[in-house]
């Protein structure tokens, strides 16, 4: 005769202790009286009403942990029924006078008369088919690729493993084989001797080094206290620069493992950190005090930072040209207002452009018109054979000269339309960038743009070869001067990964916990003991048998922080193959009465 219900159901949200406008109450509707009564009227969550006799049972977290409560429709009194303190009571259901619910991975039943929950011993015979180890095709999980200096081989990371793969012919090698660790962002050293990568095998992200011929890895960093974002080799292979979640720029000497923090910002992370071709400078972009991104160069020997752009415009993604003449970057300086059709205002879109900073005051702009000169013939001096090798070495490593004074006045724009530009690279003659329509190249001499590919491009350390990723395939070519030939993909057929789901799920759980530890907007984690919360939910990991189980546990863990928009990506969830079936249908027509008729 009456109905107890919730107006809103948000129990699937990974947000505990919620007391906002979506926190629900239990409502009772009387059809005869056409009345509605709020029987909880509490700022906490009151959900899952179950009507048994004169009592309405429901879940509530008014006492912090979600427990069963009961409301007596005669006395109008509410009392607490269960007193669990470690895990929430979840998803109750009633049948007759019995209520069943889940708590901490166990099923309980409770008689409404006794109000005493009893644990139900459940034994399930299962093959655990979704938890069995299996071999997967690693080419479907590629996250990064890096070419060897001459482009004969590449290192590819896929599903937390590092592969050493031949570009043409040879043997594919999984050089890590760690199903319980997440390896990523492997890069070949410019001298070709080593492969560096990031791994969380110790429980924290650390940098590792491995001989390109194989062998045991060497741990370069130790006792790291936060997430390593990205890293880059120096051109001489002697140093590595990397950034982390504490907004630090760290310089690592590879031979002695000496670590120097050269910069730390309270405003934000440094992005796109890279070396100059002579190893003496770094460049990066970072947010300034007005929240606009500025491009900087850093003198490694002098230990001093210099701004290249001013703070009136957003500037980012800097990279040195390989000849050492230019600093190439993108900046939002194109003001092309579009008048709104719905309001009395302008909007600004496609403000980005590609810019060159002329590092030396002696470097002429590539767009400066030149005057014709008369060529004068002269007899070339005889070359000194003893100095050939010395000259060759000097030519191969350009000296980067940066005149800081007046550098903001030596910035020129490539004649390109306003857009978004990414993945910059330049050899001093051509500038490459990814934008709408794919990878493009601008020839500074011809002052002409060419389309290279619809796939993004990465260049080898020697600046001779390029790798493209398209349609789950990798392609290696000479650095193109026009349209790239992507007709021959690299053979990835032997990228086989042995997936141990039990170890992989434990790693995912741990990385999810660290992601919140390192990235949460408050260091005090809303006053919660984040380590204790990890231990609380890690106790359930041995019982995880599917990815959905893992997602549920991670969701419960991050829900303890009591914050919105903290979601769990479902990841690789198995689903059964279903037989497609037809569905019943009906022909519908409108009747003269105003109703619809089923024909």
Which functions belong to the PLM regions below?
Residues 1-27, 31-47, 57-69, 75, ...:
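A flexible loop/linker signature enriched in serine peptidases of the S9 family
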Residues 13-16, 91-96, 105-106, 269-272, ...:
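Short beta-alpha junctions and helix-cap segments that line functional grooves
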Residues 126-142, 400-417:
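A short helix->beta-strand "capping" segment at the edge of beta-propeller domains
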Residues 1-3, 48-55, 91-97, 145-152, ...:
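Blade-terminus and WD-like Trp-Asp/Gly-His loop motifs, strongest in beta-propeller folds
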Residues 33-37, 75-79, 114-118, 169-173, ...:
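Beta-strand initiation motifs
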Residues 217-222, 237, 438-599:
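Flexible, low-complexity junctional segments that flank or bridge functional domains
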Residues 141-160, 415-436:
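Beta-strand-rich domains and repeat architectures in extracellular enzymes and scaffolds
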Residues 79-93, 306-317, 415-422, 450-459:
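Conserved blade-ending motifs and adjacent loop-strand segments that build the rim/top face
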